[in-house]
Amino acid sequence: MKNNYIYFFIILIVLIAMLFTTINGSSDSGKNSKSSSMPDLRQATFAGGCFWCMEPPFEKLPGVSKVISGYIGGKKENPNYKEVATGSTDHVEAIEIHYDSSAISYNDLLEVLWRNIDPTDGSGQFVDRGKQYRPAIFYHDKDQKNLAEKSRNKLEKSKRFKNKIETKIIKATTF
């Protein structure tokens, strides 16, 4: 009888171990499938006049998680609005777009940019005048640089604008 209890406990322990192994294995496979469907989060940084005016066209796009206003491209670390407004810091008012590249492409974002700026006006945008309002594309990697250049070239060849495209393509620095 004592042996029956020992066998019973051994079988019970083996069954419990198998149960934990099965549960652990299925939760691992869930992790793997989750990681393959995780969003591919990236950043795009554009300047095109007043940053508050640049936010709305991008904020409601599918795949865009947030749009942040800020400054880029200048000499001074952490400038404030008044300093940038003087034009003395060489910063540009810009937006940083956080997006899921599996839901929206960088090219799609470039198309939205071109539709919302005057790419031929290198000294400001619309009523916003001064170098702090100049249009620019700030690339974060070689792919973005290449896509931005191709997109700008395509726009130039389209002859949509009489004047030369003045939008610069610049390596992104601290935002």
Kindly give the residue locations of the regions a language model identified.
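Flexible coil/turn and secondary-structure edge motifs
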Residues: K2-F175
